[in-house]
Amino acid sequence: MKRILIVTGQSGSGKSSALQVLEDLGYYCIDNLPLALLPEIVAKLDHENNLEQLALGVDVRSTRADMQEFDHVFEQLQKHGTVDVIYLTTQDQDLIARFSASRRPHPLANRFKSLLQCIHEEKQLLIPIQFRATVHIDTTDKSVHDLKHILLSKLGQSDNLIVILQSFGYKHGIPLDADYVFDVRHLPNPHWDLELRRFSGLDEPVKQFLEASPQANEMFEDILHFLKKWLPAFAEGHRHYMTISIGCTGGQHRSVYMVDRLKQALEAEWSVQVLHREMKHWS
């Protein structure tokens, strides 16, 4: 496991929203587990799952005794990856307004008479964790959208659209996760050339074969023009991923070639990921 984030802070300051943002960024998120159980759970996840990014939500539903043991918990978690603590805070009046608007009780409401007392006591309970915080975020007057951009900036991650280029074979079915599908079965098929059949669209002989085809070049230019025109609009709509699927008959030659060529044309401007779905079927 490469990175573990502990997300905590005052109730009402945006912990749930922060975890949602992190989940969208690919973090595996766990919320509201007792603090004492975290080392055991993280050790199990690290052993049984190929997780690279984990986010753990912690709040005052853990006991005061648990909070005092936070340093020990923190050290145990460090055995499994780099650990950072994100601490969210908000001014008292803003917290009061948020609880009034949501009509939800404060987690300490059963112990104290007033909301302000709950807020002040919670601050004291969280001191052991706040002391360890590597990222402090004041969410006063901040929207969820603002919080997202602050998190991205603090964590050194990009808010750019990720373009997933996927090749596939129609005989194995159309991908269900595709946002756009382009059919390149009309292009000359290297499969029928016995010298080329054993290669894929990543190999130079197949590339040369298809680059000699005016149809293949025209199809490439048309798809590239579409993507260059519309990807900025998709990015402005706050999409995290856009999956563009290119299909040929078997998913070995024409679609693979087209995906590879599009990747080279787009990767200077966009974050591009490539998936060749039928690679296991290649001859």
From Swiss-Prot:
Source domain of life: Bacteria
Pfam families per UniProt: PapZ_C, RapZ-like_N
Binding site for ATP: G9, Q10, S11, G12, S13, G14, K15, S16
Gene3D superfamilies: P-loop containing nucleotide triphosphate hydrolases (3.40.50.300)
InterPro entries for this protein: P-loop_NTPase, RapZ-like, RapZ-like_N, RapZ_C
Keywords tagged on the record: ATP-binding, GTP-binding, Nucleotide-binding
GO molecular function, one term: ATP binding
UniProt KW Nucleotide-binding keyword: yes
Similarity section: Belongs to the RapZ-like family.
Stated role: Displays ATPase and GTPase activities.
This protein's name: Nucleotide-binding protein A1S_0588
